[in-house]
């Protein structure tokens, strides 16, 4: 899951989006780079630059988001910082001590060493970038996770990027819509409003939105329902065209696929992000004798 939470520092609050490091969650890390202001690239001092590290660097560079390197586990005896700096330089990440402009902080999650310096570096970078957002007007945000709760119904974790989201606001989220019935912070405490950079869980939606869907708040219920209906119709049209295209390709390959066994799958997970990762991993599996047909995936 993407973890979204805030940390109080001497220089104000910092919002963190914590994405999984496993290879299956590539799309989740890519989205994280798209909606964040600064990427904190954590590299284990005893492991060095891993394939997922290289991928995270590519996401950050592609999104043109500044990187702060945090070398973790420096308390370990086999920590090799010089090796990491060399590997990073080969990936176009030059730290300040190597003549580049990328901040590099040595930290230990076990002892707490370097954590204060890391928070200070993030605050300094945000000042240099002059990161600001309007706390007025309708809320605009991005869905970082969504799920279906037995008691609360469809819920979505949203990072507010500008404006103010209030309880009872009407919202349009992708093809879903609704009126905010309740809002909760990362500690599951109910709140009445959320401003820029605040991660918030909302209830009251018509369905579970897709991860990365944009949220827009308004006081016009009719307009929200109208746009949501148009978006749903458009999505169904796209899905139908995709199925027709797949059917045509399958017919073209019918001779070679005639003896191939097809396993139909329905993927249901706790949150949208996990479902997406499972589908991505399954599609990467290639087999000459058995094929997969994912009929449905979601929460």
Put a short name on every predicted segment:
Residues 12, 25, 50, 90-100, ...:
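Active-site phosphate-binding and catalytic loops of NTP-dependent enzymes
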Residues 13, 23, 34-54, 61-82, ...:
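Conserved Switch II/interswitch segment of TRAFAC-class P-loop GTPases
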Residues 16-18, 40, 53, 60, ...:
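Residue-level signature of catalytic and energy-coupling elements of molecular machines
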Residues 19-22, 33, 44-48, 65, ...:
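Short, ordered loop/turn segments at secondary-structure junctions
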Residues 50-51, 76-83, 113-117, 180-181, ...:
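Switch/connector loops and helix/strand junctions flanking conserved nucleotide-binding motifs
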Residues 62, 150-299:
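C-terminal effector/interaction modules appended to NTPase cores
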Residues 66, 75-136, 201, 291-298:
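Canonical P-loop GTPase G-domain recognition
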């Amino acid at each position: 899951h993407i973890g979204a939470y805030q940390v109080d520092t001497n220089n104000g609050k910092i919002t963190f989006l914590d994405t999984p490091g496993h290879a299956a969650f590539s799309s989740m890390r890519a989205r994280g780079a798209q909606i964040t202001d600064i990427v904190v690239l954590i590299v284990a001092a005893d492991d060095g630059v891993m394939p997922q590290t290289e991928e995270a660097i590519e996401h950050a560079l592609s999104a043109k988001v500044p990187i702060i390197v945090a070398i973790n586990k420096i308390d370990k005896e086999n920590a090799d910082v010089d090796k990491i700096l060399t590997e990073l330089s080969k990936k176009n990440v030059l730290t300040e001590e190597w003549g580049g402009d990328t901040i590099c902080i040595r930290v230990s999650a076990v002892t707490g060493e370097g954590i204060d310096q890391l928070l200070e570096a993030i605050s300094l970078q945000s000042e240099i970038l002059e990161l600001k957002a309007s706390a007025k007007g309708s809320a605009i945000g991005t869905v970082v996770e969504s799920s279906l709760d037995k008691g609360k119904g469809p819920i979505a974790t949203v990072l507010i990027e500008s404006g103010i989201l209030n309880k009872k606001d009407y919202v349009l989220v992708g093809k879903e819509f609704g009126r905010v019935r309740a809002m909760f912070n990362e500690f599951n405490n109910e709140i009445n409003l959320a401003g820029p950079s605040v991660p918030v869980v909302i209830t009251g939606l018509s369905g579970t939105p897709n991860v990365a869907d944009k949220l827009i708040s308004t006081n016009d219920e009719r307009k929200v329902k109208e746009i949501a209906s148009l978006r749903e119709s458009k999505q169904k049209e796209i899905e139908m065209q995709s199925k027709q295209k797949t059917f045509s390709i399958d017919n073209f390959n019918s001779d070679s696929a005639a003896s191939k066994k097809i396993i139909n799958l329905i993927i249901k997970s706790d949150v949208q992000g996990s479902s997406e990762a499972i589908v991505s991993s399954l599609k990467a599996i290639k087999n000459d004798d058995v094929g997969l047909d994912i009929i449905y995936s979601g929460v």
